[in-house]
Amino acid sequence: MRTFSTIDYSDARRALDHILEKASQLKKPVVAAVADAHGELLAFARMDDAPASSITIAINKAWTATRARKPTHEVGERVRHPEKGHDISYYGDPKFTGWGGGVPVWKDGKVAGAVAVSGLSSEEDAELAAAAAALITNP
């Protein structure tokens, strides 16, 4: 029998709370999504005035980071520069995205989920997501 680690709702809630607190301090509204080990949505938040377009983007960033087992900006780097990787259609999944801001959460050497942020620059999204993912990995 195979077993695997996945983040749970309390992990997801802790990550969301951290992201929302930091974004509030910056006075920058964001959308945040946390996915389980399968890439499926576990928790989600959209701050007031966060762009509606960021809803799907945040969810897709969490999906991509889980399924690709790497930060979404790395997926983007590979598809923007064919010499480093391949076209996004290679993944065969329209939910895959290469915008920064999705970060996998690792437990016991395997991806246990992902945290994603959308609504700011890719760099700011990635920074917030990485800090929240670290809270889950290192409670």
Predicted feature descriptions by range:
Residues 1-139:
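Flexible, solvent-exposed loop/hinge segments and secondary-structure transition points
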